Amino acid sequence: MAGRELSHLQQLEAESIQIIREVAAEFDNPVMLYSIGKDSSVMLHLARKAFYPGKIPFPLLHVDTGWKFKEMIAFRDAQAKKFGFELLTHTNPEGVAQGINPFDHGSAKHTDIMKTQGLKQALNQYGFDAAFGGARRDEEKSRAKERVYSFRDRHHRWDPKNQRPELWRTYNGAVNKGESIRVFPLSNWTELDIWQYIYQENIELVPLYFAAERPVVERAGQLIMADDERMKLEEGEAIKYEVVRFRTLGCYPLTAAMHSQADNLEKIIEEMLLTRSSERQGRLIDSDQSASMEQKKRQGYF
């Protein structure tokens, strides 16, 4: 009897689960990077499916910059409690001691010290030899050319000219001591795939993805949410309440909201079918300079 043909989402799911299982079997000390966003939520769901009814056999790591939305941190802790996975958090102590923040030091320095350096500290501290990330190739041009198994040297740096071939879904995970692999099981998914899968699987998300009235400040043509008392207003700025949602999440001073009436999954999917702009246009760190994402990844960024 002929086998049942898999749907597009089922094919993506099967591929991702196979990658997750292969990494768990092949590497000595893997970890899943958990940024709390929609892609991380899908990746967590896939990991739970991959090892059901057992528990996820590796920890989740959140690199906390201290500037995430309050709702993100509350959601992170609630998910860890609900599903019982091991959650590791790390904040760069040197950055905290220096008082590094996105307002006074700018997005580039804040991101480098609190995210890139913080991530490298955590990977070194625990000795992880593989780290899952939720990046997708459709997000940004430097990610479009990255392999599923992305080799990193002893300093966690990525060299786009020194990548390994991946033929017929055959992945090379061989590393020497101190080297590691970043693994991207969602590489072949699109933003629309992510949202349709979230709808199909009824995956919980941070409420910030859904339209609601929120306090925002308009700055350089972008809407920045005033998430707490640390929000610094520039001359002539005022907080106003607008119906907005977030297409992508990060540190709140560096993440722009968008006007939207999409307050449920069906409306978000409809919005995605009509949009012609990149989801990362709301990430202010991507506009630091030309090719900034590739430069960050070369230095060890996610």
UniProtKB/Swiss-Prot annotation:
Its EC number is 2.7.7.4. Pathway: Sulfur metabolism; hydrogen sulfide biosynthesis; sulfite from sulfate: step 1/3. GO terms for biological process: hydrogen sulfide biosynthetic process; sulfate assimilation. One of its GO terms (molecular function) is sulfate adenylyltransferase (ATP) activity. It comes from the Bacteria. Belongs to the PAPS reductase family. CysD subfamily. Heterodimer composed of CysD, the smaller subunit, and CysN. This is Sulfate adenylyltransferase subunit 2. It comes from Shewanella oneidensis (strain ATCC 700550 / JCM 31522 / CIP 106686 / LMG 19005 / NCIMB 14063 / MR-1). The lineage of its organism: Bacteria, Pseudomonadati, Pseudomonadota, Gammaproteobacteria, Alteromonadales.
